[in-house]
């Protein structure tokens, strides 16, 4: 029996997340991301998007609102924030992953 690529990816992702959590890096990266998003005004913008989306619906639905807001929210993250967080994640991965 062979394991599919998706199963391998999911397993690898779970192992990396476990290492991140156990090392304390998950919390550190998460805290830095939260600080940057707050400083950039991202949270306020996403709240505004959510209020607008919900006010347009007769019967607001979380899943539908999320599907509408999420792409916009991701686009609102400043590139400098994305780059800084990716550098942290990359540095962590370079510490734990053996390369040949």
Curated annotation (Swiss-Prot):
Keywords from the named record: Activator, Chromatin regulator, Cytoplasm, mRNA transport, Nucleus, Protein transport, Transcription, Transcription regulation, Translocation, Transport
InterPro entries named in the record: TF_ENY2, TF_EnY2_sf
Subcellular location: Nucleus, Nucleoplasm; Cytoplasm, P-body
Similarity field: Belongs to the ENY2 family.
One term of GO molecular function: chromatin binding
Biological process annotations from GO: chromatin remodeling; nuclear mRNA surveillance; poly(A)+ mRNA export from nucleus; positive regulation of transcription by RNA polymerase II; post-transcriptional tethering of RNA polymerase II gene DNA at nuclear periphery; protein transport; regulation of protein localization; transcription elongation by RNA polymerase II
One Pfam family cited in the UniProt record for this chain: EnY2
Protein name (Swiss-Prot/TrEMBL): Transcription and mRNA export factor SUS1
Functional note: Involved in mRNA export coupled transcription activation by association with both the TREX-2 and the SAGA complexes. At the promoters, SAGA is required for recruitment of the basal transcription machinery. It influences RNA polymerase II transcriptional activity through different activities such as TBP interaction and promoter selectivity, interaction with transcription activators, and chromatin modification through histone acetylation and deubiquitination.
Record HAMAP family: ENY2_Sus1
């Amino acid at each position: 029996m062979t394991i599919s690529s998706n199963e391998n990816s999911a397993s690898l992702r779970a192992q990396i997340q476990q290492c991140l959590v156990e090392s304390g890096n998950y919390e550190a990266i998460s805290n830095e991301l939260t600080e940057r998003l707050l400083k950039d005004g991202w949270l306020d913008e996403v709240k505004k998007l959510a209020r607008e989306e919900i006010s347009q619906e007769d019967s607001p639905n979380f899943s539908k609102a999320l599907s509408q807001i999420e792409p916009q929210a991701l686009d609102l993250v400043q590139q400098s924030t994305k780059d800084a967080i990716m550098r942290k994640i990359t540095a962590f991965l370079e510490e734990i992953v053996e390369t040949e």
